[in-house]
């Protein structure tokens, strides 16, 4: 019998017990589609002195030279870099990592957001494989031509998209400040930008009884990097948005801040830095928030968002519990892989098993759409 289950978005768990996030490893992803395990060459360092804000920084400067890496060949949703990092970690420990779900932060954020946003603004189209007692969740790659900035660089959407990357480039350095030549500092506004170079942190966390391993892109180090395995307390999230001038603007920003809070609290990033721009995409001000203060800001400023953060955590607990209860995860059968489709429609998360005659089945179960062959072999070798 084919497995099928659904969960209404109003469902809430009684638990709000979150596990303390811990960084287990990291990797760098290159713009030419490479994965560098335990490499921090793509890690950036925050540097945006107040005097820079007086220089009329243009967040559209260089948009025509922007290198868009979201192409057919570049799968931004692949788990392979995360799995390679996990494999290296397990080889050092000589044992399997005890978690129930392995995925990216963006997937968990979208699943949480499904209780607050419509599917039009928060599309959920995921694939899950059950292997070796664990669930691996991947987002279905969208058509690059639909999401690419190359479609129309003059559109408001494309300019807003680019301005976020530009803000990151203006606010960060590729090395700690003492190691950066003055000429490099002065040329920062002219730096050509791409969205393929990424630094990804591998974090173990969870809620209730569910243990989760999450890959999360890190924007920058805020202060300094320790020579240790866990630098979560030093990371910062960078965002750029329009200035807040009206009550309507404030409520719009609060909704954005809630989503940013979700991103950060999931993996234990404590600092959020927002750049505010005018309608001409000139950077005007920068404001810092601690992740822990965001729920209080939302509660005090917007009556409609008084309980939204606690609500989000209870929904997080509900859908992870539902996934673990619904999908069989046999620990003693390393040779069986089963695949599932997870979508969001009509106010429900819907889970359906993918049968062997489905066109997706072969790549999901026998191919490398989610699990790499090397990772599957490693888990088999671990049992010998």
UniProtKB/Swiss-Prot annotation:
Pfam families: RAI1 (PF08652)
Catalytic activity line of the entry: a 5'-end NAD(+)-phospho-ribonucleoside in mRNA + H2O = a 5'-end phospho-ribonucleoside in mRNA + NAD(+) + H(+); a 5'-end (N(7)-methyl 5'-triphosphoguanosine)-ribonucleoside-ribonucleotide in mRNA + H2O = a (N(7)-methyl 5'-triphosphoguanosine)-nucleoside + a 5'-end phospho-ribonucleoside in mRNA + H(+); a 5'-end triphospho-ribonucleoside in mRNA + H2O = a 5'-end phospho-ribonucleoside in mRNA + diphosphate + H(+)
Enzyme superclass (EC): hydrolase
Cofactor: a divalent metal cation
UniProt remark on cofactor binding: Divalent metal cation.
Binding-site residues, substrate: 217, 239, 263
Compartment annotation: Nucleus
Domain of life assignment: Eukaryota
Chain segments annotated as transmembrane: none
Record's subunit section: Interacts with RAT1; the interaction is direct, stabilizes RAT1 protein structure and stimulates its exoribonuclease activity. The interaction also stimulates RAI1 pyrophosphohydrolase activity, probably by recruiting it to mRNA substrates.
Protein task: Decapping enzyme for NAD-capped RNAs: specifically hydrolyzes the nicotinamide adenine dinucleotide (NAD) cap from a subset of RNAs by removing the entire NAD moiety from the 5'-end of an NAD-capped RNA. The NAD-cap is present at the 5'-end of some RNAs and snoRNAs. In contrast to the canonical 5'-end N7 methylguanosine (m7G) cap, the NAD cap promotes mRNA decay. Also acts as a non-canonical decapping enzyme that removes the entire cap structure of m7G capped or incompletely capped RNAs.
Protein name: Decapping nuclease RAI1
Source organism: Kluyveromyces lactis (strain ATCC 8585 / CBS 2359 / DSM 70799 / NBRC 1267 / NRRL Y-1140 / WM37)
Gene from which the chain derives: RAI1
